[in-house]
Amino acid sequence: MNQSGRCQCGNVNYYFDKEKVISAHHCHCKDCQRTTGCGKATILYIASKNIKVDGKLKFFDSKGSSGMTIRRGFCENCGSGVLSYAKELPLLKFVKAGTLEDSSWVKVDSVFFTKSANQWDCLLYTSPSPRDISGSRMPSSA
């Protein structure tokens, strides 16, 4: 596995091959804004079978803007959000790109929930820009 990431304190670590990443996205939904404390979450879609997690995650469940139950996994010790998934889609993990040891290779494919994006959250995209998926919903499949 050629990529790794971790929580702030290092109690939770994860590993995957970047070739196994399905896609990457900026999500501007209110739930992601609240859990990140900023204007968006940058997430990588990875099949659950392609990621290995060492350490114990604690999960908080809430109804997401998509209408699905989102299970948000975070470190019990430092509180860093590491990954999440929709309870209705357990075979797909959403890894927080900011927890990667090296995120320089990440290329964002699309943007979700732009209708709830804040004007103060500048969009610093390089060409080509990620495509905006409808502005109000997350795609139903990866």
Report each predicted region and the residues it spans:
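Single conserved hydrophobic/aromatic residue that forms the stacking wall/gate
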Residues: 125-142
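A short Gly-Trp-Pro
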Residues: 1-127
